[in-house]
Amino acid sequence: DIDALIQELQDRGKAITKTALSDATETEFRQKTVEAFTDIFSYIKENERFFSVLFNGRSSYSFPLKFNTYLRGRLEQQVQTKKNVIPYEHWITAVAFAYQGMIYSWVTNGMKDAPERMGEYGYYFISQSVVEITRGT
């Protein structure tokens, strides 16, 4: 019947889409991760004076914690682990603080690298972290 044919076409379409996405997973992961990190670094660069003041050591302690919460949210959107070698909560917290340290270093050293380059560095850091956390899967 027609409903069965339509269902079969839909199932085949889903299978093709799933295969296409699985073939492009690494490329998509790289692209989305670099874009997300570049967006963050571009925003910071556009607001250089503001962030320089925040990271000068005399700013409110609550800013780093709030900023870390924001970074965790961005990272969780980009990364889904398969099998955790360490508990996910510990891993994502450590990665977010490490990434915040990268931003701090970039800002306090005069933002010499372009935001796009920092986005690449962010991708490299995250991709290596994902390899480690999913080792053995």
Briefly describe each language-model feature range.
Residues 1-7, 11:
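HTH DNA-binding helix-turn interface
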Residues 9-20, 47, 70-78, 129, ...:
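A short secondary-structure junction motif
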Residues 9-13, 33-36, 63, 67, ...:
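Hydrophobic/aromatic residues within well-ordered alpha-helical segments
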Residues 18-49:
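Hydrophobic alpha-helical connector segments
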Residues 41, 68, 72, 119-127:
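Hydrophobic core segments within long, regular secondary-structure runs in both alpha-
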Residues 52-54, 115:
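Short, hydrophobic secondary-structure boundary micro-motifs
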Residues 58-82, 86-97, 131:
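Amphipathic alpha-helical packing segments from all-alpha helical-bundle domains
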Residues 86-109, 113-129:
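Hydrophobic alpha-helical segments that form the core
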